[in-house]
Curated annotation (Swiss-Prot):
CDD domains: RRF. It comes from Shewanella pealeana (strain ATCC 700345 / ANG-SQ1). The lineage of its organism: Bacteria, Pseudomonadati, Pseudomonadota, Gammaproteobacteria, Alteromonadales. GO terms for cellular component: cytosol. Its main location: cytoplasm. This is Ribosome-recycling factor. It comes from the Bacteria. Responsible for the release of ribosomes from messenger RNA at the termination of protein biosynthesis. May increase the efficiency of translation by recycling ribosomes from one round of translation to another.
Length: 185
C-alpha cells in the first residue's frame, strides 16, 4: 500500500514538472521556436483546432517563424488567430506561407518575463510540496488504521522527501535554463 502511495506521488510530481515546463514554454524569448505557437487555436469548420493540426510551423531564422498552412483557404483565419493571440506577433502572409518576425525583447521586458518565469517555477514547487503533503497524510492514515508501523511511516516520509527534492531540483534546472535563454541578446 505504501508503495502505491509513493508511485502515485512520483507520477503526480512528474506531471507537476511537465506542467511547469509547458507553462514556461509559453513565455516568449527573443529566439524563434515553433512551440511558441502551440497554444494558438484556429477556427476550422466551426470548431477551434490547434494550429499544428492545420499548418506546419518551422524556423525561418533566429527571429522568424514560418507557418505553412495545409489548406490555402485557411491562411486568413490562421493569420487572424496569430494576431489575436496574446503573444504580440504580427504575421505577414506571402502566398501559401505566413512569416512571423519576432521583435527583439527590451531589457525591461526581459526582466518582466523573468518574474513571470520565476512565478511559474514557484507554482510548480508549491504543487510538488502539495503532492508530498498528500502522500505523507495518506501514509499516516494507514498508520492510524494499523496497516503499517511507525518505522514504515518514517521510511516512507524520507522516500517522499527525496522524490520532492529531486523534482524541485528539476524545476530549478528548468528555471535556470529559461532565465539564461531570456537574458541572451
Amino acid at each position: 500500500m505504501i508503495n502505491e502511495i509513493k508511485s502515485d506521488a512520483q507520477t503526480r510530481m512528474d506531471k507537476c514538472v511537465e506542467s511547469t515546463k509547458t507553462q514556461m514554454a509559453k513565455v516568449r524569448t527573443g529566439r524563434a521556436h515553433p512551440s511558441l505557437l502551440d497554444t494558438i487555436q484556429v477556427p476550422y469548420y466551426g470548431s477551434l483546432t490547434p494550429l499544428k493540426q492545420v499548418a506546419s510551423v518551422s524556423i525561418g531564422d533566429a527571429r522568424t517563424l514560418t507557418v505553412s498552412v495545409f489548406d490555402r483557404t485557411m491562411i486568413a483565419a490562421v493569420e487572424k488567430a496569430i494576431m489575436s493571440s496574446d503573444l504580440g506577433l504580427n504575421p505577414m502572409s506571402a502566398g501559401a506561407t505566413i512569416r512571423i518576425p519576432l521583435p527583439a525583447l527590451t531589457e525591461e521586458r526581459r526582466k518582466d518575463l523573468i518574474k513571470v518565469v520565476r512565478a511559474e517555477a514557484e507554482n510548480g514547487r508549491i504543487a510538488i510540496r502539495n503532492v508530498r503533503r498528500d502522500a505523507n497524510s495518506n501514509v499516516k492514515e494507514l498508520e492510524k488504521e494499523k496497516e503499517c508501523t511507525e518505522d514504515d511511516v518514517r521510511r516512507s516520509e524520507d522516500d517522499v522527501q527525496k522524490l520532492t527534492d529531486a523534482h524541485i531540483k528539476l524545476i530549478d534546472e528548468i528555471l535556470a535554463a529559461k532565465e539564461k535563454e531570456l537574458m541572451e541578446f
